[in-house]
Amino acid sequence: MRWIGVPDVWDAREADPGFMASLATFAVLGLGLDLVVDGTVLTLTGTVPTLYPLGWQAVVWAGLGILWWFTARALVLWSRRRGVDPLPSGTPDGRDDAALDHRAWRTVLGCAVGGVVVAIVLPALLGVPGLAPVERFATLYEAYGAASWVAVLAWLVRLVGRCAVLASILAYAHRAVLGVVTLRGARWVPWGGLVLGAVTGAVALLSRGPAVALSTLVVCTLLGVVHVRGGESLRITAPFTLLAFAVL
């Protein structure tokens, strides 16, 4: 993230830690949109199926992905209105992304690859059989047959939107904590990854068990390192978040 100056509008004022925490909170609340859908279906029908009929399932997943994408975009615009750009084209010292030194890129790529490996290997080591993406596709194929590709495309739209919000939580939470913690070297601690890991890990613990919850925490911490070493830019953090959560 980079300070870009407060725009010349009547109600403009600089962002503070409380504002950044508010953005992170709104992003967390935005993740609950799927619960709103399930809750509505439960109220109307008295039950929530694992999978809806193909047409409705595709509409739900694609709709959620689009809503999440616009939520993340709205948070970016809101942040810029308060003088902070979460999508800078360069690093905090003014260099372009392409000019990041090889050590920073080596750390970014190493942590990103490590996150993917952890997402695949750690659940298996802790007793969770199978690979999540393969099992997901097998479930969709069993339910929808040859038309399962429609559901897969809708799920990918959902994944992109959801990961945009997850990366937003990480970025804004990191900046909020940095505004409060002033210890020497605090800027190198992956605060955003720890916060995101706590949030998504708690959800994973309730829905998928402790093995996936631990894997989620480790993966999010590594994504936090990616965010720090990548200049705190969502341009770098968001794609790697998508890559990691695609296999988690």
Across the structure, where does each feature detected by a protein language model lie?
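N-terminal juxtamembrane cytosolic/stromal segments of multi-pass membrane proteins
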Residues: 1-24, 79-97
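Helix-boundary and loop/linker segments of multi-pass membrane transporters
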Residues: 12-16, 100-101, 140-148, 182-189
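Non-cytosolic membrane-interface motifs at loop->transmembrane helix junctions
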Residues: 48-56, 137-141, 212-223
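Transmembrane alpha-helix/helix-exit interface in multi-pass inner-membrane proteins
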Residues: 113-135, 155-171, 175
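Transmembrane helix-loop-helix hairpins at the membrane interface
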Residues: 148-248
